[in-house]
Amino acid sequence: MSSGGLLLLLGLLTLWEVLTPVSSKDRPDLCELPADTGPCRVGFPSFYYNPDEKKCLEFIYGGCEGNANNFITKEECESTCAA
């Protein structure tokens, strides 16, 4: 392959990398956990990242236990998990 062809290939690969969305491999593992209200029943509006829908959704957190996929604001959820 000529040097011009290699340069074109390198440019196309670079463009592909820039335009490809961040994959789930780049997200923290906690973003893959399901929403977990926990056993308590206080009822705090919270947000979790839904990997199937690829967005942060609201749920009601009971106030104790649960898991790490639990954010006070949608913005915090998006900055941690959304690509």
From Swiss-Prot:
Residues 31-81 form the BPTI/Kunitz inhibitor domain. GO terms for molecular function: serine-type endopeptidase inhibitor activity. It holds the Pfam family Kunitz_BPTI. One of its GO terms (cellular component) is extracellular space. Its main location: secreted. Disulfide bonds join C31-C81, C40-C64, C56-C77. It is found in: Secreted. Keywords: Disulfide bond, Protease inhibitor, Secreted, Serine protease inhibitor, Signal. This is Kunitz-type serine protease inhibitor microlepidin-1.
